[in-house]
Swiss-Prot record:
GO terms for molecular function: pectinesterase activity. The active site is at D178 (proton donor), D199 (nucleophile). This is Pectinesterase A. Belongs to the pectinesterase family. It catalyses: [(1->4)-alpha-D-galacturonosyl methyl ester](n) + n H2O = [(1->4)-alpha-D-galacturonosyl](n) + n methanol + n H(+). The gene is pemA. It is an enzyme of class 3 (hydrolase). It comes from Dickeya chrysanthemi (Pectobacterium chrysanthemi).
């Protein structure tokens, strides 16, 4: 017995030493810490990013635990932000679409983002990105209160059309309305947690989510029996094969306070767009959301419709059956098979592998 215990202890020490050596072997080009600053340690993430040399060689920044109240726009290719821990290293800001700039104009949805990615080969690992706009407090205000913000979209992460091959590993995205905006290129989210209320994953980009938690939040401002929100609002162009693809993941509630059948899996967003003959809902935005092998709690009721404006400014409705909304082997209390929840065949589901969705890109960390 003593020999067995000794052998086990020795093996544990070897494993621990190997892990320590692997961590120690990681090379960081810059370190961000709330507590110290020297030639290679910065107090803000923005300063650390600014220290990266021109070019596209990999540049890795370690972010020590702490809350960093910053708004960042990433334009440098091949940058990795690596947190000390997912819950400990937090990047946060509190801007809504209706928040006013110094010149009196509104930030708008895209402008509200805590982090904006306009670069190729960006990566983030083991950190949290939050938009701390206080949606519940704002909704609790009277409509006659002049301080109440009407445009409550508040983006935590925005991948722009200039971004491509954006990789997020073990990252938490926290917000309410419009938490994650994927507008361009390809993004991959692995082992992530994304929480919100209304359309909290949206856009026309290609984004693959694997082994992620999609968390629907409680809304005190919604009356019992009414819809609280929607997980996705894709605006995928009809000529684009892939939109929002969720595989091997979990659709869960923030708490038991989130009512049954209060959240839709998605609704079709046809963004108002300027054309040669006017400004109206984009008819070519035939959004795609697909859930494969994903568990669903009982707060899910299915898909929903979404409104837009026609050429004359009249309200029109876009229905889920006219979009590319599908499921494959959903399970759990919120799963169902019906004419309103279309299912993929085995052959169709085989078209949604990582290599097919992401094409010639295999996500790796620097």
């Amino acid at each position: 017995m003593l020999k067995t215990i000794s052998g086990t202890l020795a093996l544990s020490l070897i494993i621990a030493a190997s892990v320590h050596q692997a961590q120690a072997a990681t090379t960081y080009n810059a370190v961000v810490s709330k507590s110290s600053s020297d030639g290679k340690t910065f107090k803000t993430i923005a300063d650390a990013i600014a220290s990266a040399p021109a070019g596209s060689t990999p540049f890795v920044i370690l972010i020590k635990n702490g809350v960093y109240n910053e708004r960042l726009t990433i334009t440098r290719n091949n940058l990795l932000l690596k947190g000390e821990s997912r819950n400990g290293a937090v990047i946060a800001a509190a801007t809504a679409a209706g928040t006013l700039k110094s010149d009196g104009s509104k930030w708008g949805t895209a402008g509200s983002s805590t982090i904006t990615i306009s670069a190729k080969d960006f990566s983030a690992q083991s950190l949290t990105i939050r938009n701390d706009f206080d949606f519940p407090a704002n909704q609790a205000k009277s409509d006659s209160d002049s301080s109440k913000i009407k445009d409550t979209q508040a983006v935590a992460l925005y991948v722009t059309k200039s971004g491509d091959r954006a990789y997020f590993k073990d990252v938490s995205l926290v917000g309410y309305q419009d938490t994650l905006y994927v507008s361009g290129g390809r993004s991959f989210f692995s082992d992530c947690r994304i929480s919100g209320t209304v359309d909290f994953i949206f856009g026309d980009g290609t984004a693959l989510f694997n082994n992620c938690d999609l968390v629907s939040r409680y809304r005190a401002d919604v009356k019992s029996g009414n819809v609280s929100g929607y997980l996705t609002a894709p605006s995928t162009n009809i000529n684009q094969k892939y939109g929002l693809v969720i595989t091997n993941s979990r659709v869960i509630r923030e708490s038991d306070s989130v009512p049954a059948k209060s959240y839709g899996l998605g609704r079709p967003w046809h963004p108002t767009t300027t054309f040669s003959d006017g400004r109206y809902a984009d008819p070519n935005a035939i959004g795609q959301t697909v859930f494969l092998n994903t568990s669903m709690d009982n707060h899910i009721y299915g898909w929903d419709k979404m409104s837009g404006k026609d050429k004359n400014g009249n309200t029109i409705w876009f229905n889920p059956e006219d979009s590319r909304f599908f499921e494959y082997k959903s399970y759990g209390a919120g799963a169902a098979v019906s004419k309103d929840r279309r299912q993929l065949t085995d052959a169709q589901a085989a078209e949604y592998t990582q290599s097919k969705v992401l094409g010639d890109w295999t996500p790796t960390l620097p």
